[in-house]
């Protein structure tokens, strides 16, 4: 708005006429000798009828007498031979698209005008001036401008420079969804670059999103369930649902404001940071090793089901083909994902500050584990006994909770200001690979796995 306003404020007067042989004629008659323009509704009506039937070529010297009618002497008037500036033509597009009646679903004014950033002094402005002069307001409610695509080095693409990129070849190499992901990931308000390395980055993002859906499809295979009252769900699941509700609100806001860069960033970050690197990582033990009747496992899969239905809808405008593939894989007879409504997610809340503190401590623990893993003292966090500063632990988490959330053998609280890690002396369960006091020696089963195996054997 500011940019258009400043350009309108500083622009000179607009000369609408052009001396060209081809274009939209200025259908006026000028009185010889006085230069006075003829203003007669009946004359105008005859001109309009002729143009409507025969096009702009109807404005011809041979029809002067027909247009003027019996009330005027054709020899007293001259037909204007000038045409309208083509920018005036473009500025009238709102009239013949939104008011012609040919497309009843379209209404004036337009919801949105979309064009390149150069149109602030072009189409956006010509449309604004024409509409304000004839209708007293802008022909659009909103304007969205898009920057131009530049070569990877920031230069304008040019055949002479040999730096042009053929979208069809890019699609053959990367696929249409990766191009869409790239286009929606850039800041559309500015000029943006494209090249092999940039597209490879978009490809990496795409694979992470695709892997999220692949995990969800595998984890939900054969799932039929309902977690019931959210208050009965494990706290981690409540937290993830709260994150989903927060994401939903932010994505709605981004979509409503055409902030597609933020939309894709929020979606990718949620899948990578909150799901793959956090939630999925923590709950894989429950998914793979708990029994079919496990309350925690059922709660996890129920949340995964909610995540699936939300994420596939969120991804559909960005990854149109992948989202359709994902949806039809789980629901072969479920129609198209692109005909689904926006998801309705549970309005769940959680103490975000408390969980942020917990996740910060988790990062500290993972950083402290890494040197031991790199030096082959331990192979994973499951072999680590961890001591954390008591002051860094949020209220409400037991040591067992922390061990589960940090994916370690054990967690204890101490007076130190830093995280300390040692290799545990416990033995490793042969089924879940956790190192626990209940395992007598490596390869034996822990109490949980013994119960699960016994249940499965009994049901066989």
Indicate where each model-derived feature is located.
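A generic structural motif
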Residues: 1, 61-63, 142, 339, ...
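Structured secondary-structure scaffolds
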Residues: 1-223, 240-283, 287, 302-313, ...
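Acidic, turn-prone loop/beta-hairpin segments
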Residues: 30, 77, 222-252, 280-390, ...
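A broadly conserved sequence feature marking short terminus-proximal activation segments
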Residues: 35-45, 375, 383-427
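Short metal-binding segments enriched for Cys and/or His
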Residues: 175, 454-459
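Short metal-coordination and nucleic-acid-contact micro-motifs, chiefly zinc-binding Cys/His arrays
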Residues: 425-428, 442-445
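Cys/His-coordinated zinc-binding microdomains
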Residues: 433-436, 447-450
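Cys/His-rich zinc-coordinating "finger/knuckle" motifs
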Residues: 436-442, 453-456
């Amino acid at each position: 708005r500011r940019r258009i306003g400043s350009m309108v404020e500083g622009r000179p007067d607009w000369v609408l006429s052009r001396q060209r042989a081809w274009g939209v004629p200025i259908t006026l008659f000028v009185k010889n000798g006085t230069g006075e323009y003829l203003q007669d509704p009946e004359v105008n009506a005859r001109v309009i009828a002729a143009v409507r039937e025969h096009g702009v070529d109807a404005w011809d010297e041979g029809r002067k007498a027909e247009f003027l009618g019996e009330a005027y002497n054709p020899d007293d008037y001259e037909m204007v031979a000038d045409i309208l500036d083509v920018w005036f033509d473009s500025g009238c597009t709102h009239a013949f698209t939104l008011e012609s009646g040919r497309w009843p679903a379209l209404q004036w004014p337009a919801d949105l005008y979309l064009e390149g950033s150069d149109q602030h002094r072009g189409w956006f402005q010509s449309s604004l001036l024409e509409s304000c002069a004839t209708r007293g307001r802008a022909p659009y409610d909103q304007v969205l401008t898009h920057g131009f695509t530049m070569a990877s080095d920031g230069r304008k693409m040019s055949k002479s420079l040999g730096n042009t990129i053929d979208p069809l070849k890019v699609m053959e190499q990367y696929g249409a969804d990766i191009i869409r992901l790239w286009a929606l990931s850039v800041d559309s308000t500015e000029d943006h670059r494209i090249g092999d390395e940039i597209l490879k980055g978009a490809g990496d993002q795409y694979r992470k999103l695709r892997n999220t859906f692949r995990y969800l499809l595998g984890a939900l295979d054969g799932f039929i369930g309902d977690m019931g009252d959210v208050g009965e769900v494990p706290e981690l699941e409540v937290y993830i649902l709260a994150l989903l509700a927060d994401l939903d609100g932010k994505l709605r806001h981004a979509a409503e404001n055409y902030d597609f860069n933020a939309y894709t960033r929020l979606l990718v970050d949620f899948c990578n940071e909150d799901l793959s690197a956090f939630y999925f990582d923590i709950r894989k033990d429950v998914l793979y090793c708990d029994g079919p009747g496990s309350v925690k496992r059922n709660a996890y899969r129920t949340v995964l089901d909610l995540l699936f239905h939300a994420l596939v809808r969120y991804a559909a405008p960005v990854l149109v083909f992948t989202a359709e593939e994902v949806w039809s894989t789980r629901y072969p007879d479920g129609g198209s994902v692109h005909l689904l409504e926006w998801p309705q997610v549970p309005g769940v809340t959680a103490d975000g500050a408390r969980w942020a503190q917990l996740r910060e401590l988790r990062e500290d623990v993972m950083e402290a584990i890494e040197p031991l893993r790199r030096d082959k003292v331990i192979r994973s966090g499951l072999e680590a006994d961890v001591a954390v500063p008591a002051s860094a632990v949020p209220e409400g988490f037991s040591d067992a909770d922390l061990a589960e959330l940090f994916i370690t053998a054990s967690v204890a609280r101490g007076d130190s200001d830093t995280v300390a890690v040692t290799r545990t002396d416990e033995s490793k369960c042969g089924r879940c690979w956790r190192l626990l006091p209940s395992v007598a020696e490596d390869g034996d089963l822990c109490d949980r796995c013994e119960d699960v195996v016994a249940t499965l054997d009994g049901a066989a």
